[in-house]
């Protein structure tokens, strides 16, 4: 009897690792999430194969075909210098969608690592990291992003860097909160007792158990990052001419919106469809992985 009590006292808690295959199986029961996933897959395929799907050279100027409406020759019409809008929207997906993916990758990796370090180290290091994050969060995201992009200079790379910097604090706070919980688990304490390094604890225990909320945050952030990159492109702080970026295309077409509606409509629709697809997918992932959000979790 005493032996069984001692054994149960030292038995480690069950590890709840992220299971990607189980997540895919759960997604099948959510039609809205499946629909958004189909939209995302189609947009990603468009991004990858856009050079071969484009019907014209996206940067070819033809002043004899300027501002033509949608037709069999130009499916989305043409812009003010005769460039084919269908080809530019397709090729522009490489910049707009890739910008969102790169931003989330940078912010997610740096923010998750800083958050886990802050939660594991504690003390002064934790206080310094979190005070810096609090200062960044106290400034409106759009204002801080525009200020950083203006300071770095107008280009797509600088715009992505500015957006990523602004998004880092969200991942830091999320990862730190998870680290504070996971580090109290019995198996983590046992690994620490047996001399496991902090990097081992972060990589093999804390970070892996923090994946579900981080994936939710990332899936929601991609749509926001695409919108933010388009916003910077619209105001001239993102991609520059003659590159085909959706936000810059909408900015160029705003002077023709009353008569040549197609100039703004098609790149704007691409931004809307992509952002909504990623946001709906993020909502579906959150409902499945976060029980506090009212989703299903088994």
UniProtKB/Swiss-Prot annotation:
Function: Part of the ABC transporter complex DdpABCDF, which is probably involved in D,D-dipeptide transport. Probably responsible for the translocation of the substrate across the membrane.
Subunit structure, interactors included: The complex is composed of two ATP-binding proteins (DdpD and DdpF), two transmembrane proteins (DdpB and DdpC) and a solute-binding protein (DdpA).
Membrane topology: Multi-pass membrane protein
Protein's UniProt name: Probable D,D-dipeptide transport system permease protein DdpC
Annotated keywords: Cell inner membrane, Cell membrane, Membrane, Peptide transport, Protein transport, Transmembrane, Transmembrane helix, Transport
Every ABC transmembrane type-1 domain range: 97-282
Alphabetized SUPFAM superfamilies for the sequence: MetI-like (SSF161098)
NCBIfam families: PRK09881.1 (NF007376)
GO molecular function, one term: dipeptide transmembrane transporter activity
InterPro entries in alphabetical order: BP-dependent_transpt_permease (IPR050366), MetI-like (IPR000515), MetI-like_sf (IPR035906), OppC_N (IPR025966)
Sequence ranges on the Periplasmic membrane side: 55-96, 239-260
Superkingdom of source: Bacteria
Gene induction: Induced by RpoS in stationary phase.
Positions in coiled-coil regions: none
Membrane-traversing stretches: 34-54, 97-117, 125-145, 146-166, 218-238, 261-281
Keyword Transport attached: yes
Subcellular location per the Swiss-Prot or TrEMBL entry: Cell inner membrane
Principal location class: membrane
Residue numbers on the Cytoplasmic membrane side: 1-33, 118-124, 167-217, 282-298
GO cellular component term of the entry, any: ATP-binding cassette (ABC) transporter complex, substrate-binding subunit-containing
Family: Belongs to the binding-protein-dependent transport system permease family. OppBC subfamily.
Biological-process GO terms, alphabetical: dipeptide transport; protein transport
């Amino acid at each position: 009897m005493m032996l069984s009590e001692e054994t149960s006292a030292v038995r480690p808690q069950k590890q709840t690792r992220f299971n990607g295959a189980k997540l895919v199986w759960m997604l099948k029961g959510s039609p809205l999430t499946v629909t958004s996933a189909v939209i995302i897959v189609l947009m990603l395929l468009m991004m990858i194969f856009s050079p071969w799907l484009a019907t014209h050279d996206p940067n070819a100027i033809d002043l004899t075909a300027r501002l033509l409406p949608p037709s069999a020759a130009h499916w989305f019409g043409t812009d003010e210098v005769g460039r084919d809008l269908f080809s530019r929207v397709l090729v522009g997906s490489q910049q707009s969608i890739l910008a969102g993916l790169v931003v989330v990758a940078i912010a997610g990796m740096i923010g998750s690592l800083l958050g886990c370090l802050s939660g594991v180290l504690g003390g002064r290091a934790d206080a310094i990291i979190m005070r810096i994050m609090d200062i960044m969060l106290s400034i409106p995201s759009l204002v801080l992003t525009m200020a950083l992009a203006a300071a770095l200079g107008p280009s797509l790379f600088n715009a992505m860097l500015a957006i990523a910097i602004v998004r880092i604090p969200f991942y830091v706070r999320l990862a730190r909160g998870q680290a504070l919980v996971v580090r109290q688990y019995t198996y983590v304490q046992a690994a620490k007792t047996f001399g496991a390094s902090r990097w081992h604890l972060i990589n093999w225990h804390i970070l892996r158990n923090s994946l579900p909320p981080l994936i939710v945050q990332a899936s929601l952030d991609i749509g926001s990052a695409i919108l933010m990159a388009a916003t910077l492109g619209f105001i001239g702080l993102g991609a520059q001419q003659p590159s085909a970026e959706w936000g810059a295309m909408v900015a160029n077409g705003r002077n023709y919106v009353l008569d040549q509606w197609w100039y703004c409509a098609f790149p704007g629709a691409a931004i809307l469809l992509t952002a909504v697809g990623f946001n709906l997918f993020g909502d579906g992932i959150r409902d499945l992985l976060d029980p506090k959000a009212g989703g299903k979790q088994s």
